[in-house]
Each structure stands twice: as C-alpha cells, then as structure tokens.
Amino acid sequence: MVNLNTIPPKNGRDYYIALGLEGSANKLGVGIVKHPLLPKHANSDLSYDCEAEMLSNIRDTYVTPPGEGFLPRDTARHHRNWCIRLIKQALAEADIKSPTLDIDVICFTKGPGMGAPLHSVVIAARTCSLLWDVPLVGVNHCIGHIEMGREITKAQNPVVLYVSGGNTQVIAYSEKRYRIFGETLDIAIGNCLDRFARTLKIPNEPSPGYNIEQLAKKAPHKENLVELPYTVKGMDLSMSGILASIDLLAKDLFKGNKKNKILFDKTTGEQKVTVEDLCYSLQENLFAMLVEITERAMAHVNSNQVLIVGGVGCNVRLQEMMAQMCKDRANGQVHATDNRFCIDNGVMIAQAGLLEYRMGGIVKDFSETVVTQKFRTDEVYAAWRD
C-alpha cells in the first residue's frame, strides 16, 4: 500500500490540476488535467482510479510541403512561435484565471524525441514555473502515451504496443517498471511510413501515415499483395529493408520501368500494381509483423488484453488485424484511442506527470530539467502502479 497523495493539493483543495507541455517532434501540445484528492479505493493502483478529467487539450502541428520531412531547427522555431498562445488558449478553455493559485504542477516532455524541439518546450516550462511559482515534473514521452491510453480505455494490465514516428515497442508492466519485451532494431514504423510518403510525394497534412492509410483503402488489387521483406527476430523486428525494397518499387513505377516484372506484365507490358497497391502491401506487411510480436508477448506474460498507443495506433487497419488475432485468444480484447489521445498531445504529459507528482516525484533543481533524446521506457520507476 502506498500513500496516493504524498504531496497534498494547493490551498487545501480537494483536487489537483496539472499543465502538460509536449513537443518531442512536430506536434506541439498543451493539456490540462484534473484529479480528485483521493481515488475511490485508497488501496488501489493510482493510475487506474485517478478519475482524470480533461480540462483542455490544444495542439498545433508543424507541417512541411509534400516530399519533405521536418528538420529539428525548423520544428523548434514552430514550437517557440506557438507555445505561448497555446498555453493561453488552454488556460482560457480550462477557465483558469490564476495559474499561481490553481495549477499544482507543470509537466513537460523530458524525452525521448528531437533535441531542439524538446529544448524549446522545456524552456517554456521553466519560464512558466518561475512566473507562477509552480513545481516541475519531467515526463517520459512513452510513459505519457501508456498512461493516457490506460486512463481512456481503462485497460487493467495489458500488453502495450507503442507505435509512433520515433518508437516501436512491445511493453508489459512488471514490478514498478514498464518492461520492453520487443522493439525495432532500426527505424520506427511511423518513420518508415513517413519516409515512404516522402518518396510518393503525398501531402504531410494531416499526417503522412494517415494519407498512406487512405490510399491503402483504395487499393484496386488487394488480392495481389506485393511481396516485401518480412523481418521478425524473436520479439524484435526490422523495417529498414522493407522501406528500401518498396522505395525501389515506387521509383520504378514512377519511371515506368517495364523491366520490373513485379509492377508490369512481362508479356503485355501493362501496369499491374498501383501506388495504392504499394501502400496496401506495405501496411499489411508491417502490421502483420506487429501482430506477431504482440501475440508472442501476450503468450509470454499470460495476458488477454492489448493496448495500442502512439500515432500509428490510430490506424483502423492495424486495430482490425490486432482484433482478429485477439479473437483466437480466450477473452481477447483490443484497446485503442482516437486521434485526440493517440497522437502526441499535452494531456498525456499532464496525466503521467500528475501521477508522478502525487507520489512525490518533483524536480528539485532546474539542473534536473535537462532533456534527453534517448530516454528508455524501462528507465522510469512507476511509483503510482500497484
């Protein structure tokens, strides 16, 4: 049993309020979360019974032209330009008149992520902390996704599939830490999809992965799945070879290279494969790999629940394939959230940070607010968990 309110709320109130700042990649998010003083069951897991109320969830995305990615310096400039106005908007939406009196803690993404954008956001967090005399909590970005997913879906102790632009991990909780059972050996799945979108020169708005998903739905030859590398090594997977292979196919398709017999009929020279077919084949291949390693983790930890978090977790086809796998397991369940919470946001940072704050995990000196691009999920001690 742990004290679920190690640090009491401000001014004798019966609730806590946290401001969360997220900016690890091209999305800048500001969120505000409210917790009651005590959960319904004082002996239980704080993160399961915290009864979070989302007061505000504001986000702005740095979007580049088709065929281009986002550079750290440009992304950081976007965050600097938008951070103050998003904070003001979030405070207004949450009806917070005096941050000094009303906000218990400011939570910021400490890592992992892109260095310059992370640094821009932590400077904003430090500034607000000094202006309002409010303590800080640094949050692991991956833990933020997990705790937000658990809060929204109420999944009790699932195997977590964390799929985003910079991370691909299969995770399960054990003994106060989120343990990584499997992960990518090279690039993340979101990175793979984004880079293929650049090859196709399709729009980056609302996101490259979403646009690939829409193209995949329109594939006219779903029965003719293009063969691609399938690289699963135990609990880990590799996606760089798949990307290299499909990039070459796309370039041959654009050039009209009829020597490529995968794309063109060897007798008539007619095109057999479309861009939509390539998108569909890439998705099916990548998602099959994810389902395989997730099922292996479920068997290992004897779990019948999967929680999909991260930006790629919004993909309906991934959710369908995972649900199909879970049907073959006793009482199998798939949990996922919509794009308000799957995609990077400030609320998830506020949620995870407030859980840590309530257990006494505050930053004692600004020297502890240095961000890190490499911050492993299993480095975090989850004091708020049973």
UniProtKB/Swiss-Prot annotation:
Reactions mediated catalytically: L-threonylcarbamoyladenylate + adenosine(37) in tRNA = N(6)-L-threonylcarbamoyladenosine(37) in tRNA + AMP + H(+)
Intracellular or extracellular location(s): Cytoplasm; Nucleus
UniProt binding sites for a divalent metal cation: 141, 145, 162, 344
Binding, substrate: 162-166, 194, 209, 213, 315
Keyword Transcription part of the UniProt annotation: yes
Cofactor: a divalent metal cation
Pfam family, one: TsaD
Keyword annotations of the record: Activator, Acyltransferase, Cytoplasm, Metal-binding, Nucleus, Transcription, Transcription regulation, Transferase, tRNA processing
Quaternary data: Component of the EKC/KEOPS complex composed of at least BUD32, CGI121, GON7, KAE1 and PCC1; the whole complex dimerizes.
Role: Component of the EKC/KEOPS complex that is required for the formation of a threonylcarbamoyl group on adenosine at position 37 (t(6)A37) in tRNAs that read codons beginning with adenine. The complex is probably involved in the transfer of the threonylcarbamoyl moiety of threonylcarbamoyl-AMP (TC-AMP) to the N6 group of A37. KAE1 likely plays a direct catalytic role in this reaction, but requires other protein(s) of the complex to fulfill this activity. The EKC/KEOPS complex also promotes both telomere uncapping and telomere elongation.
Protein name: tRNA N6-adenosine threonylcarbamoyltransferase
